[in-house]
Amino acid sequence: ASREGLSCVQVGNSGGLLFASGLLDLLAVHPARSGAASLDPFAAHAALARDVPDHPLARVDGASIRDAFAAFVAALAGAGLRYAAPSERNCSVATSIGTIKTTYAVPRTMAAGADALASRPACLVVGIRGLREFSARQFVAAFGDRWPGLRHVEIDLPGTEAAAELYAAHVARDLEARAARDRTIALV
């Protein structure tokens, strides 16, 4: 809208969640009763338009959706939030609790994880001792039967060895510094 010279107002939920996933969804499940995720969002969109012509998404053509996503991803890049270029396909990402989420576009920082889930190479999942919101052991337990060669290790984040509990927001802030990332990587 801003690109077209329109006035913009951002409206959001002021809930208690500190984080959003950063994933950009298009359409992964249609018909909803099937519960089956589709890797082709545009085929799902065409089926939605055929099956539920009054649905708001059915009123927008595929080319306009592609253009809108491209413009949105470009605007995010202009704000320093880089995304892997959306393609014609959805991708799957592993969640921290061992489930799989189908989505359309991922931040570049998550693209390697989506690629790894698709190809399932031998991988080491690194957990941080004391981190409350993620367990590498739980992740491997959830995916182990579907991902041969997946293993885990737990490390102490440099400078936090005495902390009983760590929170993702603090760890993320610490790891923004290249030196902190380098020290952490050296432990693995």
PLM features per residue range, with description:
Residues L17, T103-V188:
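Predominantly flavin-linked oxidoreductase catalytic cores and closely associated redox partners
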Residues L26-R129, Q138-P148:
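Dinucleotide-binding Rossmann-like beta1-alpha1 core, especially the glycine-rich loop
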